[in-house]
Swiss-Prot record:
GO terms for molecular function: rRNA binding; structural constituent of ribosome; tRNA binding. Belongs to the universal ribosomal protein uS13 family. This is Small ribosomal subunit protein uS13. SUPFAM superfamilies: S13-like H2TH domain. One of its GO terms (biological process) is translation. Keywords: Ribonucleoprotein, Ribosomal protein, RNA-binding, rRNA-binding, tRNA-binding.
Length: 118
């Protein structure tokens, strides 16, 4: 297994699919990375030599991935909560942020039902 950005990616899959095992890299970004390096999408990781893997690592390093991306996302949410804007309040109260209804749905976000205490 090749190791890119701290993630073991599978050898027996196509390069595009293997790169998507890295948090922050989807199919579109994986295709762009492979095009920049000059590798076809259907090439399997085990068929690549060390120079090509190093080139892929260099391209992946330009994209925020794994821990850096997770930290950036959590800092963005924290910033919204500190501002006190509507989206920040919804995050703070663990309610849907993007305008979904909450009268009957949103059980995943709100958690299990709490019984009414008499």
């Amino acid at each position: 297994m090749a190791r890119i950005a701290g993630v073991n990616i599978p050898d027996n899959k196509h390069a595009v699919i293997s790169l998507t095992y890295i948090f922050g890299i989807g199919r579109h970004t994986a295709k762009n990375i492979l095009a920049a390096v000059g590798i076809t999408e259907t090439t399997k990781i085990r068929e690549l030599d060390d120079a090509q893997l190093d080139a892929i690592r260099a391209e992946v390093a330009k994209v925020p991935t794994e821990g850096d991306l997770r930290r950036e996302i959590s800092m963005n949410i924290k910033r919204l909560m500190d501002l006190g804007c509507y989206r920040g309040l919804r995050h703070r109260r663990s309610l849907p942020v993007r305008g979904q209804r909450t009268k009957t749905n949103a059980r995943t976000r709100k958690g299990p039902r709490k019984p009414i205490k008499k």
